Design a protein with these regions (language model features):
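Inhibitory N-terminal propeptides of secreted protease zymogens
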Residues: 45-168
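Structured lumen-facing ectodomains of secretory-pathway proteins
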Residues: 202, 211-214, 218-220, 231, ...
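Subtilisin-like serine protease catalytic core
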Residues: 46, 60-67, 82-84, 184-307, ...
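Short, solvent-exposed loop/turn segments enriched in Ser/Thr/Gly
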Residues: 195, 312, 662-669, 710-712, ...
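Beta-sheet-dominated interaction scaffolds and their linkers
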Residues: 528-534, 638-675, 698-701, 718-721
């Protein structure tokens, strides 16, 4: 099955925090840059309180499949999709209705029949979980029983090894990028942003002692689960791990990932923040500051991964507990078109439960989106940059540059020495072999193909007193990690951004000072795609993913009290894990302002109104990224989302694959729903077609009454011999003073 990574912290190189769920294990991957090359790694990474994260370089994945356990899908539709029990759009399943009770009993009987069969035919196997909301299924510990034996049982539809998943890591710059404050103001202001909406954070737990989650001023709530870890802001605290009893774990936030995610999603309005002794010059807020949160801990204690059944248990419990949205900043390997965890996400969406999910941190590269982010009806997040970090000042002449620390030594008092530029011909040297001309100086070298440890060690051997490494990709400097080899270098070392390269190379020989006192730096590096952000299309069926991009690099948020000397604690993390709660919080704001909208309509409002033409390439920071399998529909704009006039289902148009040698015409129906209070005619058109040999057309207009739905048909024609590769276009919709757009995609094989 799949393996999901948590997109979390990087407090030491290659440190990982994994999250496990029922049939897949989910991981929170904490990654710090270790290599010189600016290639993205997976998972969410935290630089620690003072370390910024720009592009993760490397991380180690754990196993993607647990072959000792399986999910078994049985015949019979689950409650979320069965025609007599599935809720109407905008509603939830009524568990108290006689129809639902009766059908649940029928499904239970089917599962009991399976358990009886198991006792007779596979007595060593043990049922460890049962499901009826998202799937009619059971989780089974095989205990040596062959998977093929389970497949012979009556009523079995599919037997799938459990996947392993891992965590994937107001002038508030996050909120400014997505126009959150303007969206709040339209709906009554910050005091009502997300009020009454419940979001389940399926992660490592939430530290309720943090001021981000202080419940002062919140009305009394029914608190669920372990009330040692709940209040009237975080209203549920439960553990989901099949070894929880043996491990003696609780919902307590021992790891930092979940608290960081929860802060981005719903931190109380205007919470003062300090990072490593540096006062942040704005008071942070979550995207939905009045939202109610649930701690559904699938990575309890020091547990590093979760299986599919853990995640399924958490999803069904959150739905049953009355939550509206879940946030899954985790990921794992995909099981393709038959992935049961993605099916569960899709089914729950149809039952009114919105799932915001990380795309993964396995980019750059196509086909790297992970499960359950690959689910068709998941709100899947890619990651882009936030333009700020905390670092040390490097002063050369009249100019000061921000530099980032990492695992290497830092100065304890101001250090002044000549800047010694190391050249390899006319280029800045990567210092992957012996260097010269730096004795007594601060060596300026380039990020490149060898590890940071190697290049810094070479500079130290040549007599350098400190090292400044120039990044080779766009964005703010990243935290540098050691490579784990013996005899690590001992001199101070920092990274500076690529944008500062020319100025520093031109200052060769000038006196330079590295300051010991850290500072907050605001930069111009916004809206750069993260190199690590996983890319589509999905495997097997070749659909557009991610759906939309949100801030996910250098995201400031809360972490538990045990992670700093003087709580409350805050840190900058990076990863699609950090982008995901921006989407979950946005969904809460949209749902709060439009409570009758269905899960699909809320998703569409966010995806199909995103800003286009704003995201830049991570390698240069100059060219605009248009590839829909990198950016989806663009970077989210919450103000546009709450003002959406039309909803699309699905949110993108994917024609799958077409052989290059054939001539084919395919059609794709999109359901349009008029979200306004009056009749409207919506005009449709196709623009921005790429490649040769593939053309698109669409129904020119659709007229809909207030709240009504209708169908628009997109037609794709691929000429014989069409150029191989990815072909895309944009479907534009306008009407009633609003507009929307959707990605259109075909893969010519």
């Amino acid at each position: 099955m799949k393996t999901h990574r948590r997109l979390n912290r990087a407090s030491s190189i290659l440190s990982q925090v994994r999250i496990a769920t029922a049939s897949t294990l989910f991981i929170l991957a904490a990654t710090m840059a270790v290599l010189g090359a600016g290639k993205g790694g997976g998972g969410s990474t935290s630089t620690g309180p003072a370390r910024p994260n720009a592009n993760a370089d490397a991380f180690t994945k754990g196993p993607t499949v647990d072959t000792s356990s399986v999910l078994v899908q049985l015949k019979g539709d689950p409650l979320s999709t069965y025609v007599r029990t599935k809720p109407a759009p905008g509603k939830k399943i009524d568990f108290n209705s006689d129809t639902v009770k009766s059908y649940r009993a029928q499904l239970s009987a089917l599962r009991n029949d399976f358990k009886q069969w198991l006792q007779t035919n596979a007595p060593k196997a043990k049922v460890t979980g049962q499901y009826d909301i998202s799937l009619n299924a059971v989780a089974v510990q095989l205990n040596g029983t062959p998977k093929s034996t389970i497949e012979q049982a009556p009523q079995v539809v599919l037997v799938q090894y459990q996947g392993i998943y891992y965590p994937t890591d107001n002038n508030d710059p996050d909120l400014a990028l997505i126009s959150a404050i303007a969206a709040w103001n339209q709906g009554g202001g910050a005091a009502t942003a997300g009020a009454g909406v419940k979001v389940a954070v399926i992660d490592t737990g939430i530290d309720i002692t943090h001021p981000c989650f202080d419940d002062t001023g919140y009305p009394a709530q029914t608190q669920l689960g372990d009330q040692n870890f709940t209040n009237n802001k975080v209203i549920a605290a439960k553990v989901f791990n099949n070894k929880a009893g043996k491990l003696g774990v609780t919902p307590e936030a021992i790891q930092d990932h979940g608290t960081h995610v929860a802060g981005t999603l719903g931190c109380n309005l205007d919470t003062p923040a300090t990072v490593d002794g540096v006062d942040i010059p704005y008071d942070m807020s979550g995207v939905a500051p009045r939202v109610l949160l649930g701690n559904y801990n699938v990575f309890p204690g020091e547990v590093e991964s979760a299986r599919s059944e853990d995640i399924l248990n958490a999803l069904e419990a959150a739905y049953t507990d009355g939550f509206d949205i879940d946030n899954m900043s985790l990921g794992g390997g995909s099981s393709g078109a038959q992935d049961l965890l993605t099916k569960a996400v899709d089914d729950l969406d149809q039952a009114g439960f919105i799932s915001a999910v990380a795309a993964g941190n396995s980019g750059p590269g196509s086909f790297t989106v992970e499960s359950p982010g690959a689910a068709a009806r998941a709100l899947t997040a890619g990651a882009s940059t936030v333009p700020h970090f905390v670092g040390a000042p490097l002063t050369v002449g009249a100019s000061t540059f921000g530099v980032a620390s990492g695992d290497f030594a830092t100065v304890t008092s101001d250090l002044t020495a000549p800047l010694a530029v190391v050249l390899d011909g006319s280029n800045l040297s990567q210092a992957c072999s012996a260097v010269s001309g730096v004795s007594g100086g601060i060596a300026l070298i380039s990020r490149g193909t060898c590890t940071f440890s190697t290049k810094i060690r070479n500079a130290q051997a040549a007599g350098a007193v400190a090292v400044i490494v120039v990044n080779n990709v766009a964005g703010d400097p990243t935290a540098m990690g050691q490579d784990g080899t013996p005899n690590q270098p001992t001199i101070p070392a920092y990274m500076v951004s690529l944008a500062n390269k020319a100025a520093l190379v031109g200052a060769n020989g000038q006196s330079a000072t590295i300051g010991a006192a850290l500072a907050y730096f605001s930069t111009t590096n916004a809206d750069i795609m993260a190199g690590f952000s996983s890319q589509g299309p999905t495997d097997v069926d070749f659909r557009v993913k991610p759906d939309v991009v949100a801030p996910g690099v250098n995201v400031l948020s809360s972490i538990p009290a045990s992670f700093c000397d003087t709580p409350p604690c805050f840190a900058f993390f990076q990863g699609t894990s950090m982008a995901t709660p921006h989407l979950a919080g946005s969904a809460a704001v949209v749902k709060g302002q439009h409570p009758t909208w269905s899960a699909a309509q809320v998703r569409s409002a966010i995806v199909n109104t995103a800003d286009q033409g704003v995201l830049r390439d991570f390698q240069t920071g100059l060219s605009t990224v248009t590839n829909v399998n990198i950016i989806g529909s663009g970077r989210e704009n919450l103000l546009s989302a709450v003002n959406a006039k039309v909803a699309l289902d699905p949110v993108s148009v994917s024609f799958g694959s077409v052989p290059s040698g054939s001539s084919q015409t395919k059609t794709f129906n999109v359901t349009l729903t008029n979200l306004t209070g009056a009749a409207a005619t919506f005009s449709l058109s196709i623009a921005n077609t790429t490649g040769t040999g593939v053309t698109y057309s669409v129904t020119p207009s659709v007229s809909l009454g207030a709240g009504a739905s209708g169908t628009a048909t997109v037609t794709m024609t691929a000429a014989k011999g069409s150029s191989r590769g990815f072909h895309q276009a944009t479907l534009n919709i306008s009407g009633r003073g609003g507009s929307a757009h959707a990605a259109v995609f075909t893969f010519i094989k």
